[in-house]
Amino acid sequence: PGVSIHTGATGAMHTLLVTTQGELYAAGSNEFGQCGLGALATCVPFQLVPMTERVVDVACGRAASVVVTESGAVYTMGSSEDGMLGTCAASWHHTGPSDVTYDLARHPVRIPNLDGIVRVTCGERHVAALDRDGYMYVWGHASLARLGCGTQSDQPFPVRIPQFVRKNKQDRIRDVVAGTTCTMCVDNQERLWIAGTWRLKAVSYTHLRAHETSLH
């Protein structure tokens, strides 16, 4: 009672909510530590996730979560599979002849050298983030060219998209969203840029490129 929600996000089986006071709450499956509560038990009802500063944005992937704080710092928790945590390459150990278990971050871990972030979005297996200057960063699973950084190799650390590093702020990014197998963003001239595969098309853009769709 008395808690007002500012924003939230859902993954495959978990949910994060941010209050207007900047507190972070989590609920749902915590099998991979994606709720950031330490233990891996299912989290029901919502529980407060301890953070050292106010939270302003969140995003959820299939087995990982991303949190942005008021200062622009980014924290991740959950499975290291696909490099989703942005802090290390996917690391695992064998638990059987054909079974692999990926290392987990059970509490929020800050991504080093990534500052000034104001917006974050997750696909099922990749992440895109936007900083206050309009620069865009991506990391995680790269198949089908969904990252838009010119490679289909997974990126375990944030990569800045070079084509938006421009002096003219009108050519920088205003908003970004990650889909299951694509990433889309809008620049300050209201142009739509797309990378990856979408609408079940067999075409993939390895770099973010302007699309003919009008936003007006």
Regions found by a protein language model. Give the residues of each.
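Eukaryote-biased RCC1-like beta-propeller repeat architecture
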Residues: 1-209
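Single conserved hydrophobic/aromatic residue that forms the stacking wall/gate
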Residues: 207, 214-216
